[in-house]
Amino acid sequence: MFGLGGQELLLILLIILLLFGAKKLPELAKGLGKGMKEFKKAQTEIEDEFNKAMSDPPEKKEKESPSDKG
């Protein structure tokens, strides 16, 4: 995971605990979870739009003839 071992992750968690305190950790985790959910939702929407655009046939544009310009 990001090239981090168990000791590094434990150290990072300890620093976060010291900075924010035990009472703030659930709030931080909840906010992080919501952010990840929003990110995945946006990613899915973009993928769906891309797949739809790739599966739809291209629209043919009619060229204007010189007689149409008037």
UniProtKB/Swiss-Prot annotation:
Similarity section: Belongs to the TatA/E family.
PANTHER family: SEC-INDEPENDENT PROTEIN TRANSLOCASE PROTEIN TATA
Subcellular location: Cell inner membrane
Keyword field: Cell inner membrane, Cell membrane, Membrane, Protein transport, Translocation, Transmembrane, Transmembrane helix, Transport
Molecular-function GO terms, alphabetical: protein transmembrane transporter activity
Chain positions covered by the region annotation Disordered: 47-70
Purpose: Part of the twin-arginine translocation (Tat) system that transports large folded proteins containing a characteristic twin-arginine motif in their signal peptide across membranes. TatA could form the protein-conducting channel of the Tat system.
Keyword Transmembrane helix: yes
Native organism: Prosthecochloris aestuarii (strain DSM 271 / SK 413)
Assembly: Forms a complex with TatC.
Endpoints of the signal sequence: none
Topology within the bilayer: Single-pass membrane protein
The protein's name in its UniProt record: Sec-independent protein translocase protein TatA
Biased composition (Basic and acidic residues): 57-70
A Pfam family hit: TatA_B_E
Segments traversing the membrane: 1-21
GO cellular component, one term: TAT protein transport complex
Record InterPro entries: TatA/B/E, TatA/E
GO terms of biological process kind: protein transport by the Tat complex
Coiled coil spans: none
